[in-house]
Amino acid sequence: LSSSASSWDDWIADFKADGYSSSELVAWSYDWTQSNVTTAQQLSTKIQSVLSQTGASKVDLVVHSMGALNSRYYLKNLGGTSYVDDFVSVAGVNHGTTTASWCSWLYTSCAQMYTGSSFLTSLNSGDETPGSVSYASYWSNCDDALTPDTTAILSGATNVEVGCVSHTDMNNDHGVYEQVRNFVA
């Protein structure tokens, strides 16, 4: 899950090369300017569609950047823990970022992503990793979009610092992919 499904093309090719079929791999686009709550509701519908089409009982959910917020909202508030086996946040803004200030006045999603927002306070209250889902967060020590970069860390998750990989390269990097693949395997 990233606002543009095409951002996952490299990893989809990697998963296929490692034996996954096309029917097991779904990339989904969403409108990054809308509320994360709205996106979470749309994600819920998408996951139900995938489960119906595949006959699977659960999915592995791999997300990038803001995708962590709407996905975690889905897990925490919309019953998503019943339908997700593994959750992987790649460069996820789990605790917000000050770089969202450039758009927080214009888009609800950016205001929600800004460090200290009421959305984030609610999302991160209590258990950050609810349910029986296995959680992981992969983050870079030089990600300029995440300020501070430790905002990606989730309490209760497997948190992995991957070294210096840029924000936009995180979900294209083969080394990060290998770690994610091993986590969801």
Predicted regions and their residues:
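Solvent-exposed loop/turn segments at secondary-structure junctions
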Residues: 1-5, 22, 30-35, 64-69, ...
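Serine-dependent carboxylesterase/thioesterase catalytic core
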Residues: 36-126
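Soluble non-cytosolic domains of exported or imported proteins
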Residues: 1-6, 33-37, 41, 82, ...
